[in-house]
């Protein structure tokens, strides 16, 4: 998945940012050097950190569920990251609106953080390879989370079903010979997915709350078209995600969501 753009398909996110636009105009004076964070985002961050600190100790899945739940209702916003092959990358913290991938970024960084400074530092490790805030080292694809070292997640897709399918991709390549993201190379990668019609009760039982589900892309230049989190909710499994169609972060019944996509790629966070 390239970071989110809506023109490639009718899903909420497609994971590619072809253009990157600035977020809100007002940037906090308290922001650390090199960090772009609005006053509203700074306030949201402090509130979230306080809520997490007050939450009872929980296992990894419950911790992920709690943190991801803090974003429910947050407005959807595309193109919040800043940087391209021709524009310097900025370390953006935008918690007042999120797309499918920035939502995942912020949840993962919050899971690792007890303070504002820790969050800002951990977000660099989540979003960028080698801790280098640059367009070239941004993790543009969903499967970068498992393919980059140190890995943020393990790709568990193949172990979920005997019907899992492996396919060879050339990430970032277009059918016309161009690339989705100018200035970045084409990345050969094997992507494994479970076709939606094969995601039965047995497969769902092997998913864990906090797993990230990517909607498999038929396009050979993309790995997935949308990303969200699996939650084993009391009323049934849901897909928690930032939806452009609904305009906010929502829970969608997993069975309903599976009916709209070709298959799932599943990454299990290492923490």
Features from the language model and the residues they span:
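A mid-sequence, solvent-exposed acidic-amphipathic segment
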Residues: 170-217
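Short, contiguous, pocket-lining structural segments
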Residues: 92-96, 205, 219
């Amino acid at each position: 998945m390239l970071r989110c753009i809506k023109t490639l398909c009718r899903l909420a996110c497609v994971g590619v940012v072809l253009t990157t636009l600035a977020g809100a105009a007002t940037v906090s004076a308290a922001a650390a050097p090199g960090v772009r964070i609005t006053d509203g985002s700074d306030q949201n961050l402090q509130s979230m950190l306080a809520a997490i600190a007050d939450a009872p100790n929980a296992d990894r899945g419950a911790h992920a569920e709690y943190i991801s739940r803090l974003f429910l209702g947050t407005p959807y916003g595309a193109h919040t990251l800043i940087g391209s092959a021709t524009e310097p990358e900025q370390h953006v913290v935008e918690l007042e609106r999120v797309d499918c991938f920035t939502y995942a970024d912020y949840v993962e960084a919050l899971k690792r953080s007890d303070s504002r400074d820790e969050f800002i530092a951990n977000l660099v490790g989540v979003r960028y390879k080698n801790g280098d805030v640059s367009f070239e080292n941004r993790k543009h694809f969903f499967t970068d989370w498992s393919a980059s070292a140190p890995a943020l997640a393990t790709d568990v897709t193949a172990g979920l079903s005997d019907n899992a399918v492996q396919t060879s991709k050339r990430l970032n390549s277009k059918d016309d010979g161009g690339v989705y993201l100018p200035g970045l190379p084409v990345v050969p990668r094997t992507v494994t997915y479970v076709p939606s019609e094969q995601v039965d009760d047995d497969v769902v039982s092997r998913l864990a709350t906090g797993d990230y589900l990517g909607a498999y892309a038929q396009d050979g230049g993309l790995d997935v078209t949308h990303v969200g989190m699996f939650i084993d909710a009391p009323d049934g499994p849901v897909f928690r995600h930032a939806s452009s169609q609904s305009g906010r972060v929502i829970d969608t019944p997993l069975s309903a969501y599976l009916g709209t996509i070709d298959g799932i790629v599943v990454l299990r966070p290492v923490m």
